Amino acid sequence: MTHASILILAGEASGDYHAAALVRDIKQRSPHIRILGIGGEKLADAGMELLHHYREINMIGLSGGLATIRNIIAAYRTMKRELRSGRHHLFIPVDFPDVNMRLCRVARTAGLRVCYYISPQVWAWRRGRVRKLAKLVDRMMTIFPFEQELYREACVDAYFVGHTIVRDIPEPIDRAAARKQLNIGDNEYVVALLPGSRPPEVRRMLPMMCEAAEIFAAQFSDTRFVLPLAGGHLEPLVRDIASNYQVNVKLIHGEAASVMAAADCGLVCSGTATLQAALTCMPHAVVYKVDPLTWWIGRRIVEEDVHLAIANMLAIEAEKQGGPIKEIQDAGFQIRCRECGRPLFVPELLQKSATPEELAQWLVSFRTNESLRRAMVRGFHQIRAMLAPPKNGPTAAEIVLGLLESHPSREQ
């Protein structure tokens, strides 16, 4: 369709990141397609017309206030008006299910095709949403392979299209180049500290990490600790916390993937950074801690078989064929979930087990046990292969363009 029009809603930074890659691919194949909606700088740079910035709709909470609520209502009304305008052919909601599932209903009523990109994490909590989505979408494009079968069992036309991060962190990992870029010596032993991207996370995680670094440095004095800042606004907080510990931490603005590529091992707060750590082949432990009430509520909402490290979710899926967990076991190690006892690939130190002593012990293991290191690296290569786009399947852009071709034409 030469003059087709697509609406997109990406309500947070991760959605902006994934959707921008999709828009670039669509524009490369069909530059005349008009794409507009809600997103951020990455989507705008990729060629999407911004109706609103995602910051206007994802800041509700104690700090949001009435102004933010008004912005959310205005953005929602804008999308409803556009969906009902008759000017567009396809709606692509990107994650952000609380808003996007409502807009899917509007799109369906208006006669638009719906192609959901980045599945809501129904495998983690509220699995009943799968049945609702089956009635709302024409296609579901997933970024984790285990999601495709979950949706197809519910009669959703789902396709695993690969994870964007695989394209952004290419193989092979050039550790020497990463170190040169960051001005780190070839012979230095480097530990990466990634305490999260939000101030509350940093306040909880960084003191533990710094104390673990002190313990480790007392045994291995040649260690260099490096911390990539997720944003410049975090620097005063990070410096203030780090100043309380007898350890020198080199701060680097951004460049998280480069820091992990340069590091020998690391400690990582849960989130996207755990995938970056896996794809840069950095042995690491995942650490997370919240207040007891939040943890208690979370354990009753989230499914029992869900783990914070996506690498563990993927490794469990591959367990029957061997996979990353077997690599660890063959190296003589047993990494288990403290909650359910299940064998894991990457250690997860959560709540009571998230102590400086436990963190330091894993850093020691990564440094002193070469068999463990090699097993983890082999497992990371398998994780990458699982996240890569299927060789014989359609790409996300091809799925979108196929839906446009099958849509009844409208006058522009």
Model regions and ranges:
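Nucleotide-activated sugar donor-binding and catalytic core shared by glycosyltransferases
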Residues: 1-412
